[in-house]
């Protein structure tokens, strides 16, 4: 605002009424001037504000964004975007009834037996791979049944070996005939057991020949007993 002008009082007039009238006119003139100056300053400020508003771009009116509406479409979109978990299956408790458990055990028993048999077969196949092997024990009857040849020392004479190979089949035949017989037969007070020992331990050809003759006689005696029965 423009600075106010200092009032310069004129010299007092001679007439008092003229003095007061002139004072009132001066006061009114000053007030009018002050009002005009105020209005001019207001007009200048308004024009400056308009110029500034014309130069700066008008800001876009930002409208408040609407609140998210909970609708059926929104819920469907949420469900489609999120992966659906598989439905939980009901836990089935085992049936403890005696009739069902018995039938299940009967059905599973053959499968368990087959599994045990296969495991035993594989274990038997793996046994030869072990370092320590046990030799099977061969009985005299099995040796006689395996072709009638007795395996003895390699330095044994051929004659005694042939006699032993003839005695053992005869002893095996006596063993077959004596099965089921209540009475044990003997020949010259010699039974099947004594003839078997003689065949195993005698080394002379004469002893083995007499053992062969006694074995044949005992075999014929058992055959005659079975024919009578």
Curated annotation (Swiss-Prot):
Bias type Acidic residues, positions: 14-54
Region (RS-repeat): 178-198
InterPro entries: Adeno_L4-33K/L4-22K
Regions of compositional bias (Low complexity) in chain numbering: 55-64, 71-82, 100-122
Any one of the GO CC terms: host cell nucleus
Pfam families the UniProt entry points to: Adeno_L433K_22K
Compartment annotation: Host nucleus
Chief place of localization: host cell
tRNA processing listed as a keyword: no
Induction remark: Expressed in the late phase of the viral replicative cycle.
Annotated region (Necessary for nuclear subcellular location), positions in chain: 172-199
Gene Ontology annotations of biological process type: mRNA processing; regulation of RNA splicing; viral DNA genome packaging; viral genome packaging
Modifications made to the protein after synthesis: Phosphorylated in vitro by human PKA and PRKDC. PRKDC inhibits, whereas PKA activates the splicing factor.
Source organism, top-level taxon: Viruses
Region called Disordered, residue ranges: 1-157
Alphabetically ordered keywords of this record: Host nucleus, Host-virus interaction, Late protein, mRNA processing, Phosphoprotein, Viral capsid assembly, Viral genome packaging, Viral release from host cell
Subunit structure, interactors included: Homooligomer. Interacts with DBP; this interaction occurs at a unique vertex during genome packaging. Interacts with IVa2; this interaction occurs at a unique vertex during genome packaging and seems to potentiate IVa2 and 33K oligomerization.
Family, per entry: Belongs to the adenoviridae splicing factor family.
Job of this protein: Promotes alternative splicing of late transcripts by promoting splicing at weak 3' splice sites. Required for the temporal activation of major late pre-mRNA splicing at late times of infection. Induces the splicing and expression of the late capsid vertex protein. Probably functions as the small terminase that is part of the molecular motor that translocates genomic DNA in empty capsid during DNA packaging. This motor is located at a unique vertex and comprises at least the IVa2 ATPase, the small terminase 33K and probably a portal. Forms a ring-like structure of about 17 nm in which genomic DNA is translocated into the capsid. Stimulates IVa2 ATPase activity in the presence of the viral genome. Once the DNA is packaged, the terminase detaches: the 33K protein is present in the empty particles, but not in the mature virions.
Extra remark beyond the main annotation: All late proteins expressed from the major late promoter are produced by alternative splicing and alternative polyadenylation of the same gene giving rise to non-overlapping ORFs. Expression of packaging protein 2 and splicing factor is controlled by a L4 promoter distinct from the major late promoter.
Domain notes: The tiny Arg-Ser repeat region (RS repeat) is necessary for the splicing enhancer function.
Record-given protein name: Protein 33K
Species of the source: Human adenovirus C serotype 5 (HAdV-5)
